[in-house]
Amino acid sequence: MERPMARSLEGRRAFSHRKSYKGQKHTVIGAISIDGLVCIKAIKDSMKGENFETFVSKNLCPKLSKGKVVVMDNLKIHKSEKVQQMITDTGAKPLYLPRYSPDFNPIEMLWSVLKSFIRRFKPQTSFAMQQVLRIFLLVLNKSFFKNWFAKCYYCTS
């Protein structure tokens, strides 16, 4: 989030080359498919293992079924036995990408577009951040997801 005020000499406009103020931290976690957004959740802090496990059990697993594949990077919390077990219990299969391979992960493109969308609107409060996220979700359409999967070398037909 952006700082709402700044200091300067009287009669002079405040100017800064680089933002040095860090606002409140927000973390967004989600899952996508070629058909669109599967689930998404915003957290007002850093992601912790228990937050991810809760997301998987309450948001992701109810939408999984036999034959689905959950593609994740090699983040430690993604590879926990509890998360793997929750996913396999639904009949889905967890699949882990090689290290340092965001080019094969379509959700990285979603995060990139979301970050630029947030930078453009510059929300200054948590409420404004939630509103920007809601608007972003309304703007997304199925063609975005299909193109992101195609760009990551997944079969889209």
Predicted regions and their residues:
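Short, basic/hydrophobic alpha-helical segments
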Residues: 51-69
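Extended, low-complexity cationic-aromatic segments
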Residues: 1-57
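A short alpha/beta connector and helix-capping loop motif
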Residues: 1-17, 83-98, 117
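C-terminal anion-handling pockets and recognition modules
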Residues: 107-157
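A generic "structured core" feature
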Residues: 56-59, 87, 134, 139
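Short, solvent-exposed loop/turn segments at secondary-structure junctions
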Residues: 33-37, 76-78, 100-103, 154
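Short conserved AdoMet
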Residues: 33, 64-65, 141
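RNase H-like two-metal-ion nuclease catalytic core shared by retroviral integrases
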Residues: 72-74, 81, 95-119, 127
